[in-house]
Design a protein with these regions (language model features):
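Conserved ATP-binding/catalytic motifs of P-loop helicase motor domains
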Residues: 1-435
Length: 435
């Protein structure tokens, strides 16, 4: 089943309620999952107390912008996941608009393998939650599109394509907006943006929220007013990187650069030839291709950071957790996370990534990134008291402007770095499956 709802209709609350009901009825043991909650990004998964869909079900991941073909788990890996999911009652996939049709097929195939059946999704109850007018997959087609015959042959290895969404999914929706409840003006404005029909009133409202000072000044002003600092939302990674660097430089504390350690499968760096080092150099600013670990991590006491991997899910040290650096030491970084009462020490981790066809690199680094600014894709599903948003025409893709604006609870919490009149011409919306 697919449960739809615009941003703010308490889809996350519904997910939490279902999990509580499952736990109350069946009482899962420690380490056992009966209600599997997953999402396409770390922050979205953290927001609903789940894991990324790729992590839990060990799905094929992207390499250089392309998703690899489906592969079966090793016997040992399949045994472990079967033990974890042996009493699974329901799977909930949140933020389904960002799940591609190919990953939907991979999920079905993985569940077939785990539970030894050719029934859809391993014959397990599967609930998809989200808004298909929000962000589509970064790479790939939306879940409701039929997979092309070419992809079916090259990635899945079968002859004919099937529209899994059309074959399996029923539809219902949530209709009451709780996030912007009581702010009717903001709600109407969001609705017009969602459907790509910006009224003159909406445009005037947006223009009135553009600030004139520098982003550093505005950030510090908002930081002094609220309990948690604001988040800056941009459409492109390069813009986020620039803002993160500007905010780090604006701190009065000493900036410290922490380099990674890269080794090959044998544990040696001596074998890296000139070509290999050149390839690694090209990935310096692309941590998404290096297992989420930075080549050089620049930090300072007082800077905002986000955790990039799960350290201890029982205390909330999970991929997507946000906090402030309290101390930087040789082997650890002390961080006060927003949702944890006491500072936590984060140590270096080692992750493996493929550099070329026959070469895997093991990288050791602190699993952190600066977190003043983030791409809109990464934060879909959050609810924010305050946000600084760039609404220039570089906002690209279906639903991106709407998603960014709808994350904010009230109009007073909305602060725009820019607004381009041409935005009215470039906002487009997916109109299928709106109910």
């Amino acid at each position: 089943m697919f449960i739809s709802g615009v941003g703010g209709t308490d889809k996350s609350f519904l997910i939490e309620a279902i999990k509580c009901l499952v736990d109350d009825i069946w009482h899962p043991k420690s380490g056992e999952i009966m209600c599997a909650i997953v999402a396409p990004t770390g922050i979205a998964a953290f927001n609903v107390g789940g894991l990324t869909i790729h992590r839990l079900f060990q799905l094929p991941i992207e390499h250089e912008g392309k998703t690899t073909g489906y592969w079966a788990l090793s016997k040992e890996a399949q045994k472990r996941i079967k033990m974890t999911l042996k009493n699974l009652k329901i799977i909930i996939v949140d933020e389904v608009s960002m799940v591609s049709n190919l990953n939907l097929a991979y999920l079905h195939m993985r569940l077939e393998d785990i539970f030894g059946t050719n029934e859809w999704f391993g014959s397990k109850n599967t609930l998809f939650v989200g808004d298909l007018l929000q962000l589509p997959p970064v790479n790939g087609r939306p879940v409701f599109k039929k997979i092309s015959n070419q992809l079916v042959k090259t990635r899945i290895g079968v002859a004919n394509a099937v529209n899994i969404w059309k074959e399996t999914v029923e539809y219902d929706k949530l209709t009451i907006n709780e996030r912007q409840k009581g702010d009717e003006t903001f709600f109407k404005m969001l609705d017009s943006v969602r459907h790509g029909c910006l009224t003159d009133e909406t445009i005037d409202k947006l223009k009135s929220h553009v600030f004139k000072v520098s982003i550093q000044e505005k950030y510090k002003e908002l930081e002094s007013e609220g309990t948690n600092p604001p988040i800056c939302l941009f459409s492109k990674v390069d813009a986020c990187k620039k803002i993160n660097e500007l905010m780090l430089e604006s701190l009065e504390t000493e900036k410290i650069e922490l380099a990674c350690v890269d080794v090959d499968e044998s544990g040696s760096t001596a074998k890296f030839d000139k070509k290999t080092r050149k390839k690694l150099g090209k990935l310096k600013d692309h941590s998404s291709k290096t297992a989420g670990l930075e080549t050089v991590l620049s930090l300072a006491v007082g800077c905002r950071v986000m955790l990039r991997c799960n350290i201890d899910v029982t205390v909330g040290l999970v991929n997507g957790a946000i906090g402030t650096v309290m101390g930087i030491y040789a082997t650890r970084i002390s961080i006060k996370f927003d949702h944890i009462d006491v500072p936590c020490d984060i140590e270096r981790v080692t992750s493996r990534f493929m550099l070329s066809k026959n070469l895997y690199i093991h990288r050791k680094q602190f699993p952190l990134i600066l977190f003043y600014a983030i791409t809109i894709h990464k934060c879909q599903g959050l609810s924010l008291d305050t946000a600084i948003i760039d609404l220039s025409t570089v906002v690209f893709g279906d639903g991106m402007a709407y998603v960014a604006l709808s994350l904010v609870r009230t109009l007073n919490g909305l602060h725009l770095l820019s607004y381009d009149p041409l935005l009215k011409l470039v906002i487009r919306a997916l109109m299928k499956f709106t109910g």
